[in-house]
């Protein structure tokens, strides 16, 4: 039987059904091919073609290539572990690719796998790569698969859940794995890899299941790219907020009594307050009204909103007598109650309610991660109630506010617009009008954006912002979401010029997103060296010796009265030690005082980078810092 195949150049050829992409690549003279894309599905070179299709080929230079070679590297890792620890002692979990790498989960019986073992595992992987074992894909019956994996309980569990009568397996040498692919043609294609770490991971992410050993790794087509990535990881580890947070006395975590619920220490609270004050100032200027809504509300509210039916597994509940309450996972129902507390005319719109609202959402312990993934967090949530004709201008206002806030921290960002999914509520004409309003607002703001067709929420289109930090990593933070569902569920209306009730449009919007997460991003973005305006301590006053302490106290008091956050370090430690401690604490400025300074009334100032400025007039120092703080400058003025 013949099938028609459209080639990369657009030409069409006929081949026998079962022809492999490798054979077509060889025939048309395309070299250095490692895989294929068949009708937008990643496809092994040795996997037969069964239908009419369009094909293009993947080389190591193509963006699809990492999915092939990192997936294969995960299998090479598993094969190496089984060789070293014994096939009978290793129970295999799963081994997928992830962003910039891969991992494999193992249940090691009669032994233990730690980070000290990674070098010898790497050596065994290099042997497997050198062996250049052919990788073969097979489709077999479930019964055959159960026989092959009869000693692999986790694989048997997966086989039971696969729909249909057949499954796919991959073989390389003595190693066989249950897998959908895709993979390289052999183990010797990519040689540049590194095993990175070992951690615990519950099977399938559930605390009810056994804890497995997860080994993380990365791989690249070029040695240079691997080396650059390892340097990037080294820098990222230095900036890790989980390390810097406690070191800088910003926050702490207690997994025994409050997993996923950060404790903010005095210095961390200063940063949070500065972030909130900055945001409040901008919101007041733009006509937002700040409100506070209850943390706990009756279950009936959450039944109306739909959270009870669709989000209950992520919520916390409280029962008291006959009543049942929920700890709020979102702020929107509370804001709707505020809106509905009085009659609203079209003349009152738009109404912009804003809240730093604490919410709680259950997350599995295995996915909790410092401040980035938590169970308790604060959202800078706002809800705008407006008429359909006001959507475009309101979105434009939010875009301007987002840009103002992100620019203040030196962030650039990327924008995505997600449109109507197949499963949606509301009239398609309303969706089209709303989506066009979002597009027009983005165009008027001059923002380039990518459209994600069909990726909107079922209750409305949305705009997402991905900020880029100093290491080039992207973080999804701000969201603008149009909602057609909540206003209908809660009968959110206004009296129009025709004296009739009309359903209001509701715009959800957050900019920091989670205040805690944004704080964590800032720690890593600035490596803990915050701009002076948000630095927990702005000036460290350091007397050279005990006899200079009284003079140092007077200087510290004077600076404090001028509104600066000052730390007087008059401990009986060496001067060098105290200066180093101030630098470790990332304090922007150090004022060092000895005989010369106290007699002249002029300051010796050091910046945290080590720059020294002598004979600084007190008034000049105060005026310079005040302007730096008032203008919320990113750089230290005295370093310029």
Swiss-Prot record:
UniProt catalytic activity: tRNA(Thr) + L-threonine + ATP = L-threonyl-tRNA(Thr) + AMP + diphosphate + H(+)
Localization (cell): Cytoplasm
Necessary cofactors: Zn(2+)
Enzyme class: ligase
Annotated stretches, region: Catalytic: 240-531
UniProt xrefs under InterPro entries: aa-tRNA-synt_IIb, aa-tRNA-synth_II, aa-tRNA-synth_II/BPL/LPL, Anticodon-bd, Anticodon-bd_dom_sf, Beta-grasp_dom_sf, TGS, TGS-like
SMART domains in alphabetical order: tRNA_SAD
A molecular-function term among this protein's GO annotations: tRNA binding
Positions of Zn(2+) binding: 332, 383, 508
Keywords: Aminoacyl-tRNA synthetase, ATP-binding, Cytoplasm, Ligase, Metal-binding, Nucleotide-binding, Protein biosynthesis, RNA-binding, tRNA-binding, Zinc
Quaternary structure and partners: Homodimer.
Task of the protein: Catalyzes the attachment of threonine to tRNA(Thr) in a two-step reaction: L-threonine is first activated by ATP to form Thr-AMP and then transferred to the acceptor end of tRNA(Thr). Also edits incorrectly charged L-seryl-tRNA(Thr).
Family: Belongs to the class-II aminoacyl-tRNA synthetase family.
Database matches in PANTHER family: THREONINE--TRNA LIGASE, CHLOROPLASTIC_MITOCHONDRIAL 2 (PTHR11451:SF44), THREONINE-TRNA LIGASE (PTHR11451)
Protein name in the entry: Threonine--tRNA ligase
């Amino acid at each position: 039987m013949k099938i028609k195949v459209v080639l990369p150049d657009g030409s069409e050829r006929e081949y026998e059904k079962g022809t492999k992409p490798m054979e077509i690549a060889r025939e048309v003279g395309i070299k250095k091919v490692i895989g294929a894309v068949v009708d937008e599905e990643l496809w092994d070179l040795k996997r037969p073609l069964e239908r009419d299709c369009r094909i293009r080929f993947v080389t190591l230079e193509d963006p699809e290539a990492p999915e092939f070679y990192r997936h294969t590297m995960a299998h090479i890792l598993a094969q190496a572990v089984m060789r070293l620890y014994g096939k009978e002692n290793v129970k295999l979990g799963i081994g997928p690719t992830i962003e910039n790498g891969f991992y494999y989960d193992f249940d090691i019986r009669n032994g233990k796998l730690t980070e000290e073992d990674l070098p010898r595992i790497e050596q065994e992987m290099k042997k497997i790569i050198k062996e250049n074992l052919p990788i073969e894909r097979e489709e077999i019956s479930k019964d055959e698969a159960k026989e092959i994996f009869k000693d692999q309980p986790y694989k048997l569990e997966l086989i039971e859940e696969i729909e249909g009568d057949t499954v796919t397996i991959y073989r390389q040498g003595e190693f066989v794995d249950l897998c959908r692919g895709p993979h390289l043609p052999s183990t010797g294609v990519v040689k540049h890899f590194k095993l990175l770490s070992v951690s615990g991971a519950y099977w399938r992410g559930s605390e009810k299941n056994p804890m497995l050993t997860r080994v993380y790794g990365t791989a690249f087509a070029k040695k240079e790219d691997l080396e650059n990535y390892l340097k990037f990881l080294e820098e990222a580890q230095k900036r890790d907020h989980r390390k810097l947070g406690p070191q800088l006395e910003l926050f702490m975590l207690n997994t025994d009594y409050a997993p996923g619920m950060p404790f903010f220490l005095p210095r961390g609270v200063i940063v949070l307050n500065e972030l909130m004050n900055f945001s409040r100032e901008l919101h007041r200027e733009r006509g937002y009204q700040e409100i506070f809504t209850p943390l706990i509300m009756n279950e009936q509210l959450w039944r109306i909103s739909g959270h009870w039916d669709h989000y209950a597994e992520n919520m916390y509940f409280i029962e008291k007598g006959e009543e049942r309450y929920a700890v709020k996972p979102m702020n929107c129902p509370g804001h709707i109650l505020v809106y509905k507390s009085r009659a609203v005319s079209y003349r009152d719109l738009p109404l912009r309610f804003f809240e730093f609202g604490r919410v709680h959402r259950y997350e599995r312990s295995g996915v909790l991660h410092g401040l980035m993934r938590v169970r308790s967090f604060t959202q800078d949530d706002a809800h705008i109630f407006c008429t359909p004709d006001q959507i475009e201008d309101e979105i434009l206002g939010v875009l301007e506010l987002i840009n103002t806030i992100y620019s203040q921290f030196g962030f650039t960002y990327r924008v995505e617009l997600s449109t109507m999914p197949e499963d949606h509520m509301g009239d398609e004409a309303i969706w089209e009008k709303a989506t066009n309003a979002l597009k027009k607002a983005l165009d008027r703001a001059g923002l380039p954006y990518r459209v994600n067709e069909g990726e909107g929420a079922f209750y409305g289109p949305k705009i997402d912002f991905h900020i880029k930090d100093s290491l080039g990593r992207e973080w999804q933070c701000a969201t603008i979401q149009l909602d057609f569902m909540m206003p209908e569920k809660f009968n959110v209306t206004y009296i129009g010029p025709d004296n009739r009730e009309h359903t209001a449009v509701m715009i959800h919007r957050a900019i920091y997103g989670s205040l805690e997460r944004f704080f964590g991003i800032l720690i890593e973005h600035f490596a803990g060296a915050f701009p002076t305006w948000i630095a927990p301590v702005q000036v460290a006053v350091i007397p050279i010796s005990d006899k200079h302490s009284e003079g140092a106290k007077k200087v510290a008091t004077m600076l404090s009265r001028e509104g600066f956050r000052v730390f007087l370090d008059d401990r009986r430690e060496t001067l060098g030690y105290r200066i180093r401690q101030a630098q470790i604490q990332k304090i922007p400025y150090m004022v060092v005082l000895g005989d010369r300074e106290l007699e002249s009334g002029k300051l010796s100032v050091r910046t945290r980078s080590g720059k020294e400025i002598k004979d600084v007039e007190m008034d000049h120092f105060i005026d310079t810092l005040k302007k730096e703080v008032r203008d919320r400058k990113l750089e230290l003025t005295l370093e310029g």
